[in-house]
From Swiss-Prot:
Keyword RNA-binding: yes
Domain RNB, chain residue ranges per copy: 479-809
Pfam families: OB_Dis3 (PF17849), RNB (PF00773), Rrp44_CSD1 (PF17216), Rrp44_S1 (PF17215)
Species of origin: Caenorhabditis elegans
Protein name: Probable exosome complex exonuclease RRP44
Lineage, uppermost ranks: Eukaryota, Metazoa, Ecdysozoa, Nematoda, Chromadorea
Length: 961
């Protein structure tokens, strides 16, 4: 935000002159009038002079901070301290802080993260501890000419404020203390003012035991080196050189993505989304997963290729000795060694190096301290839960206390001479291994908003005894009464947030009326309200194994919006007239009032359909829906829609202890496909309607066509099994997958479809009008246009689509901002992110509960080889949805060799393991490391000499795994 002053109480006018230099080096002079005021508050609560200036005094010095070096005081902080240590100011130990206008503008210009934190602290999170003082508009503190020749302009303005406030507060016995970062600055200012301190010096003199945590946060900066150490990484190019390189095409901008198999390798997806460059070793140059980086292509003779080798920090740390783990000598570590193997030209890929960071993706990371054998050591390595993030070096004197806890650490900076980024301890989450702590880590790591709904959100809810009223309308069109229709819902067992229900009835010789009825969430969630803002922030409901984190409060999600059986509910209905061949004759949309005749599970609905004795209206409607769904499915697959596969399991939970009793692979029923087909049809129909009405701002969902190169793992795997995969079109891909059937290996087709899923791009929400129309298509569904309409209880995208459709048919007014393309794009950015994070959180929850389930158990299972690497195999266990690495120690003596090109493992020349073939494994939990128990696979059949333990790759998070 920008700071402004009131337009009254002007004391005088001064001329303020600034000089600036353009890119060609020419110097310009700019002069502007400054209206100086005498009514700007000093911020002191006791100040009788300033109390009538209409501001809220914040500095309540009657409850002073106790500091051994100064008495009653307030703090004036310089910009460098705020920029370097902005996280420290979250602490309530630092209060009665004054941020001058000069410092505010300096931080804003130099450091966006620090500015955002400062803005949040001053005006939201800690406004009772901060006061912004407009020193450059105050008649007593503004100075155009220099009064102190030995001070910089910034130092002089800071000192001017301190001297004024010292005099102004004299009768209150309060002194301002100036906090600075730079030693030279402190010495210069002390020539003119008594109370100047380093930030660290001030904290050291606090009379509060909590100061140690603040000192730990500062310690990382003191250990960053004096510039004489060996430089490990290249220096970044300047901002100007990067911009010039991007303009000329010699430098590209892209997103840095670390390999899940080899932490020394990464890929940069260039901004055009059509190009990717490979980066390895020190050429990653301090980039962290998710950073936006500037990259430069290396000369072709320096190109290389992925090692096809499993390199996980967990693996390498597991085989190190305890002494190695505690070793502080970074030069002795081989993490930064470059790969030695020279690739043939035919095997290489476009290889680049990071030459600069355009935007950091740093955040606060959950994890744990690695053990150190150096007694009393201050420097420690922090192991993030997210495996794609490097170890972080922190300094703390609380290591013994924190060793059994999950903690949060932030990265501060990454010097060229440090193998690891340097950071600081932020806070503790809880005891390592406890269910509550590990779940909290999971949610924090995936940035899942999970705080209880605020009072302002709950105030938006209707009364719990609310009942529908057919005459209650939000727009000019009346709500249609559909309570006489035989409508039912079909959902998973235990579902309480029922979004959708269906009906089907024959209305002619070859005509059927089919309806999809969706919960009318937008009747309750109105634009611009606190509940709408919260739903927009959360973006989606998150489903974990042992809990659900709702997008909307329970009163709506599980009651008033949920289409429960035998209860009247508001709905948004999409009703088709179609033939028995599923040819649509007409479609209509209206807000409605329905009464579901039954809330069925998938299993119960299947049972009713299959039982010829069931002849009631619900059974007849379900059978009609099933017949039509099979026609719709055949048509979609005929057009090239893909049928993909993934590993899905469900847990039978003990809800008292929140522990898994049983793990089951999800079974697919025809009723799953039945419901899916009509949800897809409704989404497509609504997409067509809102795009027709709002071609520049309809919220749609597209699935980009994957790059041909991304299919390589699939194509190679199929080729080694004797099948050809066609990737030139969606239909070609679908048809070739259908042909990949091996009677000796019934799982082969499913495994290939799982590999296909991994080759796909991510489907995304977008605003119509922001990409060319041909790119609107949804590749996986083989349809030209698509959106999400059918789940507004758990997806905010559907809420927006409901509003667009309601406006299009006159069922509701067009709300402010609804038709704004820029606003739609902003919403899409957030819900794309939230959707992705919710998926990752769900998978991490499965893996965490698999570990809990196997604690104290050992089981032998069938697995399938999903990949062969130079030092191990990747094994998928369908029964538990578990995919892990078994590391093989090959040697000439054992006769074991791995052929990555042929995707096989050989013993004495004979192939014993091939990709996509079954193996027998033993599953258990390895608890040798008390801090980090993990699932372990051991190969039982075929027996291979030199077997090591596994390290789970199915989730990058490593939450307890």
């Amino acid at each position: 935000m920008d700071l402004n002053v009131k337009q009254s109480g002007i004391h005088s006018v001064a001329l303020h002159t600034t000089y600036f230099q353009n890119r060609s080096g020419k110097v310009y002079k700019r002069a502007e009038e400054r209206y100086l005021r005498n009514d700007l508050s000093c911020g002191l609560a006791q100040c009788g002079t300033c109390k009538d200036f209409g501001t809220n005094p914040l500095l309540k010095i009657e409850n002073p901070v106790r500091n051994a070096k100064v008495g009653r005081h307030a703090l004036i902080v310089d910009s460098t301290s705020l920029i370097r240590f902005y996280d420290l100011f979250d602490s309530s130990l630092l209060r009665d802080l004054i941020v001058t206008q000069t410092v505010w503008e300096g931080v804003k210009a130099k450091a966006v993260p620090a500015y955002k934190k400062m803005n949040s602290l001053c005006y939201e999170d800690a406004k009772d501890r901060f006061h912004v003082f407009m020193n450059e508009f105050h008649c007593e503190t503004f100075s155009e000419s220099s009064k102190f020749e030995d001070l910089s302009r910034g130092e002089e303005l800071l000192l001017s404020t301190a001297l004024y406030l010292k005099t102004h507060w004299q009768k209150h016995n309060v002194a301002p203390v100036v906090l600075v970062f730079d030693e030279d600055s402190k010495k210069r200012m002390e020539n003119h003012y008594q109370h100047v301190m380093y930030l660290k010096e001030y904290i050291q003199n606090l009379e509060d035991p909590g100061k140690q945590a603040l000192l730990d946060q500062m310690a990382a900066y003191e250990s960053s080196g004096n510039g004489n150490e060996k430089q490990i990484f290249d220096e970044y190019l300047s901002h100007d050189r990067i911009m010039e390189g991007i303009a000329s095409g010699t430098i590209k901008r892209g997103n840095f993505s670390v390999s899940r198999e080899n932490y020394r390798e990464a890929t940069v997806i260039i901004d055009d989304q059509l190009t990717s460059w490979f980066i390895t070793g020190n050429n990653c140059n301090r980039a962290v997963n998710g950073d936006t980086v500037a990259v430069q292509l290396l000369p072709e003779d320096q190109w290389t290729a992925p090692e096809k080798k499993i390199r996980l920090r967990d693996v390498e740390e597991y085989v190190k000795t305890a002494d190695d783990m505690g070793n502080e000598d970074e030069e002795n570590d081989d993490e930064n060694d470059e790969p030695k193997a020279k690739k043939s030209k035919k095997m290489t890929v476009s290889t680049a190096k990071v030459v600069g960071i355009i935007k950091r993706n740093w955040r606060e990371y959950c994890g744990m301290l690695l053990p150190s054998t150096v007694k009393g050591a201050r420097r420690h390595l922090f192991c993030p839960a997210e495996r794609l993030i490097p170890r972080i070096r922190i300094e703390t004197e609380q290591a013994e206390t924190l060793s059994q806890q999950r903690i949060v650490v932030a990265i501060d900076h990454w010097p060229r001479d440090s193998k690891y980024p340097l950071g600081h301890y932020v806070r503790s989450i809880g005891e390592m291994g406890s269910r509550e702590t590990e779940n909290e880590v999971l949610l924090l790591e995936h940035d899942i908003p999970h705080a209880p709904f605020s009072e302002s959100v709950l105030d938006c809810l209707p009364r719990e005894e609310w009942e529908p009223d057919l005459t209650e309308n939000r727009g000019p069109l009346p709500r249609v009464d559909l309570r006489d229709l035989t409508i039912c819902s079909v959902d998973p067992l235990g579902c309480t947030d029922i979004d959708d229900a269906l009906h089907c009835k024959q209305i002619g010789e070859d005509l059927f009326e089919v309806g999809v009825h969706i919960a009318d969430v937008t009747h309750f969630v109105r634009p611009g309200t606190a509940i709408d803002d919260e739903a927009a922030l959360r973006g989606t409901t998150v489903y974990l194994c042992d809990r659900r984190i709702d997008m909307l409060p329970c009163l709506l999600s599980s009651n008033l919006c949920s289409l429960r059986g035998e209860e009247e509910r508001y709905a948004f209905s999409c009703i088709w007239t179609m033939t028995s061949s599923a040819d649509i004759q007409s479609v209509k949309y209206h807000k409605s009032l329905i009464k579901s005749k039954a809330a069925l599970t998938y299993e119960k609905a299947q049972e009713i359909i299959d039982d010829p004795k069931e002849q009631n209206d619900v059974a007849l409607g379900l059978r009609g829906l099933m017949k039509l769904s099979k026609v719709l499915n055949a048509r979609r697959t005929g057009n090239g829609a893909l049928t993909l596969a993934s590993s899905e399991v469900r847990f039978d939970m003990d809800w008292e202890s929140r522990t898994p009793k049983k793990v089951m692979e999800k079974q697919h029923l025809d009723t799953h496909s039945m419901v899916e087909e009509f949800m897809l049809l409704a989404n497509i129909s609504v997409a067509e309607k809102i795009l027709e009405e709002y071609p520049d701002c309809a919220l749609l969902r597209r699935h980009p066509v994957p790059l041909k190169e991304s299919y390589k793992p699939l194509v190679e795997a199929a080729r080694h099994r004797g099948f050809e995969i066609i990737v030139e079109s969606g239909k070609g891909l679908a048809d070739s997958l259908n042909r990949c059937v091996d009677k000796k290996n019934p799982m082969l087709n499913r495994l290939l479809r799982m590999l296909t899923t991994r080759c796909m791009t991510q489907a995304v929400y977008f605003s119509a009008g922001t990409v060319p129309v041909p790119q609107y298509q949804h590749f996986g569904l083989a349809c030209a246009i698509y959106t999400h309409f059918t789940s507004p209880i758990r997806r905010y995208a559907d809420v927006i689509v409901h509003r667009l459709l309601a406006a299009a048919i006159g069922a509701d007014d067009i709300q402010s901002g609804l038709l704004n393309q820029a606003r739609c794009t902003k919403i899409c950015t957030n819900i794309n992110y939230r959707h992705k994070q919710a998926q990752y959180a769900g998978r991490a929850s499965v893996q965490l509960n698999v570990v809990r389930y196997f604690k104290g158990k050992v089981e032998t299972c069938e697995g399938f080889v999903m990949g062969v690497r130079n030092n191990g195999i990747q094994v998928f266990v369908p029964k538990y949805g578990l995919e892990s690495i078994i590391v093989l120690q090959t040697s000439a003596a054992s006769g074991t060799t791995i052929d990555v090109e042929e995707m096989s493992v050989k013993v004495n020349g004979d192939v014993v393991i091939k990709e996509l073939e079954p193996v027998t494994v033993r599953i258990s939990v390895n608890e040798k490391n008390q801090q980090r128990p993990r699932v372990e696979l051991q190969l039982i059949k075929p027996a291979i000499p030199g077997l090591s333990v596994d390290f789970d790759l199915s989730s990058s998070e490593g939450l307890g795994l």
